[in-house]
Amino acid sequence: MDKQTVLTTLNRIMELELAGVVRYTHYALMVYGYNRIPIVGWLEKNAEEGLAHARAAGELVTWLGGHPSLGLGPLLESHKHDIGDILRESLEHEGEALRAYYELLDLVREQDVRLEEYARDMIAQEIAHQDEVNKMLRRPGQTEPYTS
């Protein structure tokens, strides 16, 4: 196992998850309209989840003898705050995190069971989140998955 590449990937995951915390917090502040309360609650839950994911990645970094990053992943302010725009941006962000977890899995497969199980668990969580957002982007009665 290339420990330095694993540490770099874990730090990138941590940065992406922390960017998600900022992103979801911002989105929660920008929701207006009749459905504001449940949507804000959902966005705040995602911010809390992102912080937990960042902490988990950071713990792995330190367990491996590395130094957790103070950086943040990319933050794109589109100035679009329609719920549909927020969900599409969320889907894109989650896809980037999912790719990073798959990259980690490829690096540690059959070399470190703890990191492999961590990566698999996070992949399952990210896929479930993408599926949830995908359903939210569908029109009422639409059963086919949303495609951009």
Predicted regions: what is each one?
Residues 1-148:
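Iron-associated oxidoreductase/ferritin-like identity signal
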